[in-house]
């Protein structure tokens, strides 16, 4: 599972997920990419599940890049605990996703295979996504 090795603070405020992704919105490494068109949070488990779907479909061919990293801790209090007594412990890690963010990239495979692989990966994610190609300038 992806998570930071160490952080300055153990817990973070919830915050707001507003605006569009400007950083990480272009296809930088591979030929084809899966881009988020909706906003939300991706957990480390969801990122890993989609990565597995991608690698299993592509098999030995191609190289895959994961362009998102879960760096925000989400806390939760245990079940049947009364309110108060401070914030709960860190339960899992999430990556906040804005529309336009590139999630995964792939190269070394045909466009048809890339589309199929990204369709399988997108089914594992709670966001609306789209398939994009690298534009050559």
Curated annotation (Swiss-Prot):
GO cellular component: cytosolic large ribosomal subunit
Gene Ontology terms, MF aspect: rRNA binding; structural constituent of ribosome; tRNA binding
Protein name (record): Large ribosomal subunit protein uL16
NCBIfam families: rplP_bact
HAMAP family: Ribosomal_uL16
PROSITE patterns (alphabetical): RIBOSOMAL_L16_1, RIBOSOMAL_L16_2
Gene3D superfamilies: Ribosomal protein L10e/L16
Protein family per UniProt: Belongs to the universal ribosomal protein uL16 family.
InterPro entries in alphabetical order: Ribosomal_uL16, Ribosomal_uL16_bact-type, Ribosomal_uL16_CS, Ribosomal_uL16_dom, Ribosomal_uL16_sf
Keyword tags: Ribonucleoprotein, Ribosomal protein, RNA-binding, rRNA-binding, tRNA-binding
Record note on quaternary structure: Part of the 50S ribosomal subunit.
Any one biological process term the GO annotation gives: translation
Pfam family, one: Ribosomal_L16
Biological role stated in the UniProt entry: Binds 23S rRNA and is also seen to make contacts with the A and possibly P site tRNAs.
């Amino acid at each position: 599972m992806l998570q930071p090795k160490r952080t300055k603070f153990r817990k973070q405020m919830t915050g707001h997920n507003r605006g569009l992704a400007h950083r990480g919105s272009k296809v930088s490494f591979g030929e084809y990419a899966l881009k988020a068109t909706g906003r939300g949070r991706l957990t480390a488990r969801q990122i890993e599940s989609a990565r597995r779907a991608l690698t299993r479909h592509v098999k030995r061919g191609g190289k895959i890049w994961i362009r998102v990293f879960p760096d925000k801790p989400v806390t939760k209090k245990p079940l049947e605990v009364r309110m108060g007594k401070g914030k709960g412990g860190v339960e899992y890690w999430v990556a906040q996703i804005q529309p336009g963010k590139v999630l995964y990239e792939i190269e070394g495979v045909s466009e048809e295979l890339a589309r199929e692989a990204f369709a399988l990966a997108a089914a594992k994610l709670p966001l609306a996504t789209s398939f994009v190609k690298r534009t050559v300038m």
